[in-house]
Regions:
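As written
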Residues: 124, 143-144
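Flexible glycine-rich beta->alpha loop in the catalytic core of nucleotide-sugar glycosyltransferases
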Residues: 125, 132-134
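Substrate-recognition "cap/lid" segment bordering the active-site pocket of phosphatases
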Residues: 29, 57-108, 113-122, 136-140
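Short, acidic loop-to-helix structural element flanking the phosphoryl-transfer center
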Residues: 25-52, 58-65, 89
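Short acidic-hydrophobic, aromatic-tinged amphipathic segments that line or gate anion-handling sites
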Residues: 146-150
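Glycine-rich phosphate-binding loop signature in dinucleotide/nucleotide-binding domains
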Residues: 45-48, 98-105, 161-165
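A metal-dependent, Asp-based hydrolase signature
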Residues: 1-24, 34-44
Length: 170
């Protein structure tokens, strides 16, 4: 909210509530992209720590996690209403503290400039996915390790990325 409406901090709570109510009332699907469930299960089976750093509020995040039956996959989750908003890196710092992972051993996977800027500001390696919010051109500005065109390409890249200890998904 600080990024979108910096001039009206007194309205942030009411805007978030209105957005959340509208999103819930009009959401047709909280499913993941095809292949994400398999990817997450594979990463977890490798012993990696998985985390979520989202712009959603806790209510929205919990709804998605419940619908996708993925509670067991994530070591920690952070929602926008629990910490500073993206692109402030505090959300990622909190995740690293909880997991005990060094920033160099983590990677942020994101589909928006806010995700990649947040990781860049912290010095965290980052991967863009070009099938989400922002275009490849926008994501490229944040110097990601790669930009995956689809989930299969992301999965293939992560298999070869040896220094991984934790994965943060946005």
């Amino acid at each position: 909210m600080q990024t979108l409406f910096p001039e009206a901090p007194e309205l942030h709570d009411s805007i978030l509530k209105a957005y959340g109510d509208h999103y819930i009332a009009n959401s047709t699907s909280d499913a993941w992209f095809e292949g994400i469930s398999e990817l997450l299960h594979d990463l977890k089976a490798q012993g990696l720590k998985l985390a979520v750093a989202t712009g959603k509020n806790r209510r929205g995040l919990d709804r998605v996690i419940a619908k996708t039956q993925s509670t067991h996959l994530f070591d920690v989750t952070r929602a926008a209403n629990e910490t500073r908003s993206k692109p402030d890196p505090l959300m990622l710092q909190e995740i690293l503290t909880v997991t005990g992972v060094n920033v160099e051993q983590a990677v942020m996977i994101g589909d928006s400039s806010y995700d990649l800027e947040m990781a860049q500001r912290l010095g965290m390696p980052r991967i863009g996915v070009g099938y989400g919010v922002h275009s490849v051109d926008v994501l490229q500005k944040f110097q990601p390790l790669t930009i995956a065109k689809n989930v299969q390409e992301l999965h293939s890249f992560l298999r070869g990325y040896a220094q991984l200890s934790t994965v943060d998904v946005a």
